[in-house]
Amino acid sequence: MKTIDLNCDSGESFGAYKMGNDDEILPFVSSINVACGFHAGDPSVMRQTIEKAMQHNVAIGAHPGFPDLIGFGRRNMNVSASEVYDYVLYQIGALDGFVKVAGGKMHHVKPHGALYNMAATNPEIADAIAKAIYHINPSLLLYGLANSEAFIQAAVKYNITLVQEAFADRTYKQDGTLTSRTEENALIKNEEEAIKQVLQMVKEGYVSAVNGEKVAVQAQTICLHGDGEKALQFAKRIYRTFEHDGISICAPK
């Protein structure tokens, strides 16, 4: 039986501001990426998100981003590799403290937003992220963009496991990177299109780029953005489609 991980960005509410459908989505995913307070989230939200994830037996990962609450961590920042290392180490450590107090074990790290996209094409940024993971806990998995040489090389250098990620609700360019959110066609909002893209990636090993070109992709985990307009509908539909097609949903080991 084919196995795939279905992950979702979670814990992105902040104080009185609620974001995402965390509680509703949890039953349909196998792992979550918890915001650590830099781009979103706060200590109370972090704790509550972890506790709920453990109730659903969902794997917990840190979702470190740039210190940019106003921009939600989706704006590039001119930072050094050393600064990225510090940002990531700090955020992993913060979330890990909450996970341990709750009696759980952290599973992975997935960079957020602009940090993720920069790391996918910038070896120095990817190296800083992998180094932070290695220094705090080398058994943590690294979720990174499928086929990214920067992520692959960083994971090999520090002997950490890379889980190659693809996206259900984002479009792709012909070089295998994600279409920028500044472009009108960056997001997939149609449920049928999202399902078609996911099945192509999981079953056939490719994704159709915005120009129609087929791009090879070996997806080990599929991401849904928890703040997406139709995140809950997509999660339910993907979950049921996988069940129907005999595809097991399970967090990677």
Swiss-Prot record:
GO BP annotations, alphabetical order: carbohydrate metabolic process
Pfam families: LamB_YcsF (PF03746)
Stored InterPro entries: Glyco_hydro/deAcase_b/a-brl, LamB/YcsF/PxpA-like
The keyword Amino-acid biosynthesis is annotated on this UniProt entry: no
Keyword Nucleotide-binding: yes
Coiled-coil portions: none
Gene3D superfamilies attached to this UniProt entry: Glycoside hydrolase/deacetylase
Superkingdom to which the source organism belongs: Bacteria
EC number: 3.5.2.9
Reaction catalysed by this enzyme: 5-oxo-L-proline + ATP + 2 H2O = L-glutamate + ADP + phosphate + H(+)
The protein's assembly and partners: Forms a complex composed of PxpA, PxpB and PxpC.
Membership in a protein family: Belongs to the LamB/PxpA family.
Name assigned to this protein: 5-oxoprolinase subunit A
Organism: Bacillus cereus (strain B4264)
Gene that encodes the chain: pxpA
